[in-house]
């Protein structure tokens, strides 16, 4: 997809952009590179649920973000880093004010930070009219995080390598009950743990899709975090359930919204969650399409 259009940069107009969650429907770790990065085979699917970024482009050079993340400087914020990376790649010196309505938990395995970075790249490329295509934006995003490219490209995908080799996929669009145990898990803590499985055999996509979906991180996460173990055990009483990413979120899959809502109502006091639908086209792409048609 090409983002080129005939628009001039769009200043001082509030625009709203979705920043959806993702699930890893399966996640296998097949090796580790000399630089420490892990080789993966994973299946990404988006959810129709996530944060919202309200972005106003400006003709000043300032990039401002509200609210700030406690303990994180503006320059270390992934949203700021994405905006600055786009400026570095294109030479533009335009600015933006970005408001974030944050509902995705940090340390949950839903890709919230990566999704925020991707939405920033896609939105500002449109608002600033920097004319990069999605492949180039994905390349910029990869330097910000391994999960950023899938959010930029906007389609559910089978991913290999460190997550950057993406093959479009169309898993069934099921309903999910996503729960968040009361713990935040840093990805680096799981991927550096000596007991993490790192030698799962590589398989063809056909074989993976036909098999039982699992997550190689789940065993060690459940051992290290009893809250996650308790959540998985509770959900398994009702439906197939597993960890997404490195956690801490755990999801159960259902064939209908009614089934998922019924179990949501049964959640114990110690577990919080939400119901969302798996979607194979990111809500971000629909929003970009609507904006882009204004500039044909």
Curated annotation (Swiss-Prot):
Active site: 22, 147
Catalytic activity: 4-CDP-2-C-methyl-D-erythritol + ATP = 4-CDP-2-C-methyl-D-erythritol 2-phosphate + ADP + H(+)
One matching Pfam family: GHMP_kinases_C
Gene that encodes the chain: ispE
This protein's UniProt keywords: ATP-binding, Isoprene biosynthesis, Kinase, Nucleotide-binding, Transferase
Record GO biological process: isopentenyl diphosphate biosynthetic process, methylerythritol 4-phosphate pathway; terpenoid biosynthetic process
Function: Catalyzes the phosphorylation of the position 2 hydroxy group of 4-diphosphocytidyl-2C-methyl-D-erythritol.
Binding site for ATP: 105-115
EC numbers: 2.7.1.148
Pathway(s) of this molecule: Isoprenoid biosynthesis; isopentenyl diphosphate biosynthesis via DXP pathway; isopentenyl diphosphate from 1-deoxy-D-xylulose 5-phosphate: step 3/6
InterPro entries the UniProt entry points to: GHMP_kinase_C_dom, GHMP_kinase_C_sf, GHMP_kinase_N_dom, IspE, Ribosomal_Su5_D2-typ_SF, Ribsml_uS5_D2-typ_fold_subgr
Organism of this sequence: Photobacterium profundum (strain SS9)
Similarity comment text for this entry: Belongs to the GHMP kinase family. IspE subfamily.
Stated name of the protein: 4-diphosphocytidyl-2-C-methyl-D-erythritol kinase
Gene Ontology molecular function: 4-(cytidine 5'-diphospho)-2-C-methyl-D-erythritol kinase activity; ATP binding
């Amino acid at each position: 997809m090409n983002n080129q259009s005939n628009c001039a940069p769009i200043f001082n107009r509030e625009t709203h952009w979705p920043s959806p969650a993702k699930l890893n429907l399966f996640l296998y770790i097949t090796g580790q590179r000399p630089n420490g990065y892990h080789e993966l085979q994973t299946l990404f699917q988006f959810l129709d649920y996530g944060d919202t970024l309200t972005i106003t482009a400006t003709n000043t050079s300032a990039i401002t973000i509200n609210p700030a993340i406690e303990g994180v400087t503006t320059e270390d914020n992934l949203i700021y880093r994405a905006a600055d990376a786009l400026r570095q790649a294109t030479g533009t010196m335009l600015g933006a004010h970005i408001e974030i309505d944050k509902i995705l938990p940090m340390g949950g395995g839903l890709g919230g930070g990566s999704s925020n970075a991707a939405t920033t790249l896609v939105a500002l490329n449109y608002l600033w009219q920097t004319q990069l295509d999605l492949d180039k934006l994905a390349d910029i995003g990869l330097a910000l995080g391994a999960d950023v490219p899938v959010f930029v490209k906007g389609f559910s995908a089978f991913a290999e390598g460190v997550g950057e080799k993406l093959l479009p996929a169309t898993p069934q669009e099921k309903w999910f009950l996503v729960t968040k145990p009361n713990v935040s898990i840093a990805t680096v803590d799981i991927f550096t743990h000596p007991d993490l499985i790192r030698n799962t055999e590589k398989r063809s996509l056909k074989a993976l899709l036909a098999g039982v979906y699992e997550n190689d991180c789940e065993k060690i996460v459940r051992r290290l975090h009893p809250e996650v173990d308790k959540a998985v055990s509770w959900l398994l009483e009702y439906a197939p359930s597993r960890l997404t990413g490195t956690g801490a979120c755990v999801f159960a899959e259902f064939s209908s919204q009614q089934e998922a809502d019924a179990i949501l109502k049964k959640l114990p006091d110690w577990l919080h969650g939400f119901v969302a639908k798996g979607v194979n086209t990111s809500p971000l792409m629909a929003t970009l399409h609507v904006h882009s048609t204004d500039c044909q």
